[in-house]
Amino acid sequence: MSLNQVPAGKDLPEDIYVVIEIPANADPIKYEIDKETGSLFVDRFMSTAMFYPCNYGYINNTLSLDGDPVDVLVPTPYPLQPGSVIRCRPVGVLKMTDEAGEDAKLVAVPHSKLTKEYDHVKDVQDLPELLKAQIKHFFEHYKDLETGKWVKVDGWEDAAAAKAEILSSFERAKK
């Protein structure tokens, strides 16, 4: 099955599938899966010497306000392979704006059928403070050395906001 055939989830917005593009702790290379071919492309080499603090991917069959599928960060005990799909539960969203407009990043944890490690995490506030600080710091600075690019982090919102983002982006993609 091609990655573009992966559904958005098992039971939106509570139970989602995230297609991983970049593993946690990866080198500063921005990968993107081409939505038409399902191939993993190098989007760019990041100028800052930073690594992704979580696995990074997207929810298929969604369309966020920036014109791309909804971005999702997935903390896991181990880095995931690019192109893998993980079943998750949304717990929050980091609201941001960049040079292209609004750019929210959802945070979702692995479903309890995969690991019990995140069962206590019901909302972004339940994540470790250090992890939230690392995520925020990464997105505040990962474009610092790229001419004409910038990011403004507006702050964290809860699981309800993440679920609302999933539903609205799913409806937007159907139009």
Swiss-Prot record:
Binding site for Mg(2+) 2: 71
Compartments where found: Cytoplasm
Residues that coordinate or bind Mg(2+) 1: 66, 71, 103
Top-level lineage group: Bacteria
EC nos: 3.6.1.1
GO molecular function: inorganic diphosphate phosphatase activity; magnesium ion binding
The keyword Transport is annotated on this UniProt entry: no
Family under the similarity heading: Belongs to the PPase family.
Protein name in UniProt: Inorganic pyrophosphatase
Organism of this sequence: Yersinia pestis
